[in-house]
Amino acid sequence: MPKLLTDWSSQAAKRVTWLFTDVDDTLTWRGKLPAETLDAMQQLSLAGINVVPVTGACAGWCDQIARLWPVHGVIGENGAFWITKRQQQFHHHYCVPFSEMRKRQRYLLEQVKQVLASYPGLTLANDQSFRFCDVAVNIAQDRTPLSVELIEELLLQLRQLTVFGDPVQATESSIHINVWTGNHSKRSSSQSYLSQALNGEVNQGEVAYVGDSCNDEPMFSWINNSVGVNNITPYLPKLACPPQYMTRQNGGYGFAELAHFLLSAKE
């Protein structure tokens, strides 16, 4: 089980200069971005802690995050791309050529639709048309959440799909099942993002991550300074590698709690 956030030594916490974070139900809570969360991101930025959202959210959502939020950049669609802003210029990096990414997505989309046809009432995510790479199935966003059994059944079927002979990945977040083709992941793209930003000189002790669900496990297994917001509790039995620490509060309020802890450690 994760330890309390207060068990993290202030000596170790004050070294953190990069905070990677999930978005839905980690920065947000019940579909809203709390004012406390936005203020926490701003305070972290002012203190020299670079915040990088790493999300399964669509490209359209990521564009406004990069433009409007006090963040260093954003990694979207579970690592398919990232966006940074430097000297008023936006830079996009894609894990595969953009045209190839869209071609594979179109092919995958038709296959996922065929799977969903056997489940009346199940739909794609409302933001599917704003996605570059993945296909998202709505399991809990603005609808009654699906049962654990049905989610597991869907994951099993979706993971059996192929795109031009290549297997697909499928992972569960708090609101969607995200399905994509390619070797990218939250972890691999976060590693590449950090290596690019630091010219390859990455110090694990300076990096932290916070998340809330199963699709954050690769990040928990990579980053030693890993934190779960309190609402990760129902997912803990599913995690072979849970976060090291956990906040007392849920979602964005838990993120603000983490931010205040990191800022206090630097005082």
Predicted segments, located by residue:
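Mg2+-dependent phosphoryl-transfer enzymes with acidic/Ser/Thr/Gly-rich catalytic loops
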Residues: 2, 9, 14, 34, ...
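Active-site phosphate-binding/coordination module
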Residues: 32-127
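Active-site T/S-Asp motif of two-component receiver
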Residues: 21
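Conserved acidic, metal-coordinating active-site core of Asp-based
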Residues: 115-222
